[in-house]
Amino acid sequence: MTQITPQPGIMDIALYQGGAAHVDGVSNVTKLSSNENPLGPSPAAVEAMAEAAATMHRYPSSDHATLRAAIAETHGLDAERIICGAGSDEIIAFLCQCYAGPGDEVLYTEHGFAMYRISALAAGATPVEVKERERVTDVDALLAGCTAQTKLVFIANPNNPTGTMISEAEVARLADGIPEDAILVLDGAYAEYVEGFDAGAQLIAARHNVVMTRTFSKIYGLGGARVGWAYGPQEIIDVLNRVRGPFNVSTTALAGAEAAVRDTDYVQRCRLENAKWRGWLADQLAELGVPSDTSCTNFILARFASQSEAESCDDFLKQRGLIVRRVAGYNLPTALRITIGDETACRAVAAAVKDFKAGAAE
């Protein structure tokens, strides 16, 4: 029998592992493994989605015009240069599908989001991992890694899973230094957690080869709705729209996202609450001998003395019903990524790590 084989690169893709949500034998758990907003979505978004559910027998908008207009109004952008997707993951895949293929290279940082590599391989391109400097994007290393085959350069700023970010000046230096026929993709999934940060919008206005992606899954609390968007040069957005399915974002998701992006007061509340407990938890863990880099996101990367200690602490937390994220798959085997939950969750994490450390010292 003739064997049916997939395209080159597909079988090199490891199945994506999302954050765990259950612990065997533990009934009451707190999920802190997927960087979800503990406050949930805006009540306005929930109401809008409930109302939209009454029209689910109709196809959704094919051009997402009302959502694009709301995004443009909120962020001061040109709606014609916005594309919406089923999460920013889909747009990352569009970029690789349209601009990278066999013989092309896609650069990303050593601790970068897993979907960059996955999408590159799915397009038949060669993913190229570039070293970071102390868990921070290294612009010089990225520039040194560029070749004539480089077509896409992905960086998350702020980065996941490290929580670190580089300055706008460094991002501009990177944009200036990559090949002119390559696209710099700025993944701004966590941009809303940084007060006043535009995630590269001004840079895009001045360059022909920079795109930023954003999501409604983090500060907006709509991970279950699957909505993302991107902003870039008109020519690139036009290309991406040619491979986008006509009804790729559902009616309820469009309604919820529009209401969420307009509810700027709620976003500010989420930002401030996150900053408060992020700082508190980081300080508590540091006092226990568990340091973390200054985070610009809704999580902290807690660093332990060894992989064994990190894994033992993770097991201990699970028995307390606290689910965090091991990140050995991101080349960070001695660390745990901990989503910033509400006050109760943060206090529970601090208490559990304290008990773990005390037990380990006995």
UniProtKB/Swiss-Prot annotation:
One Pfam family this sequence matches: Aminotran_1_2
Keywords: Amino-acid biosynthesis, Aminotransferase, Histidine biosynthesis, Pyridoxal phosphate, Transferase
Biological pathway: Amino-acid biosynthesis; L-histidine biosynthesis; L-histidine from 5-phospho-alpha-D-ribose 1-diphosphate: step 7/9
InterPro entries in alphabetical order: Aminotransferase_I/II_large, HisP_aminotrans, HistidinolP_aminotransfase, PyrdxlP-dep_Trfase, PyrdxlP-dep_Trfase_major, PyrdxlP-dep_Trfase_small
NCBIfam families named among the record's database cross-references: hisC
Self-association state and partner proteins as the record states: Homodimer.
Protein name in the entry: Histidinol-phosphate aminotransferase
Organism: Ruegeria sp. (strain TM1040) (Silicibacter sp.)
Gene (name only): hisC
